[in-house]
A protein has these predicted regions:
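Mg2+/Mn2+-dependent nuclease catalytic core
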Residues: 116-183
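Metal-dependent nuclease catalytic cores that hydrolyze phosphodiester bonds in DNA/RNA
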Residues: 1-131
Length: 183
């Protein structure tokens, strides 16, 4: 469950669903580390707030209106970080998701595990890795949380980022069907 191992040198020796996306869209970028973006930071904070809220204090947040301000540039030390008003919006999303009885039940109730890494052979002798956001053993489901700026475009996002192959790989790694909860 160590992020350093999963995302570091050890983890890079195995294929992941992200690799499928890169190979399909830009094979020359295969193996190149992903650049942080505000959207990735937002999604990461949302996941942490839902799945590992005790780790939120490790995430740097700057109280500035934009990333172009002097305050932000001085405090960020050249690293992309979240702005306080972005965190405020994420907290509303967290509250909204957990206010939904069905979603909350799937995420919080019963025999559930969070941030579960998996490793195994999916295609012949090729090892694949995946990290399940939530495994609900009572419902026999893998639950993946997705944030989106536009729910109407989710079907295109699912195609672009190959949610179908993610579900296939995770089903093989963890043995349960996968559902996506998007907000």
């Amino acid at each position: 469950r160590d992020d350093e191992l999963y995302y570091g040198d050890f983890g890079r020796q195995f294929r992941s669903n992200s690799d499928i996306s890169v190979l399909l869209s830009n094979p020359l970028a295969f193996g190149v580390p992903t650049t942080k973006t505000p959207a990735l930071l937002t999604g990461g904070y949302f996941h942490t707030a839902i799945l590992e809220p005790d780790k939120l204090n490790r995430i740097k947040v700057i109280d500035a209106s934009t990333r172009n301000t002097k305050v932000y540039k001085e405090m960020s030390e050249g690293e992309l970080t979240l702005l306080q008003h972005e965190v405020d919006k994420i907290e509303i999303l967290v509250d909204t998701l957990l206010a939904n009885e069905t979603a909350r039940g799937l995420i919080r109730d019963g025999d559930v595990e969070y941030e579960v890494p998996g490793l195994g052979k999916v295609f012949s002798d090729m090892y694949w890795k995946g990290k399940a956001d939530i495994i609900n053993h009572d419902e026999k489901l893998i639950i993946d949380l997705k944030t989106t700026s536009d729910l109407d475009k989710l079907q295109w996002t699912a195609k672009k980022y190959n949610y179908d192959s993610q579900a296939f790989v995770y089903k093989n790694l963890f043995g349960y069907d996968m559902i996506f909860i998007a907000i």
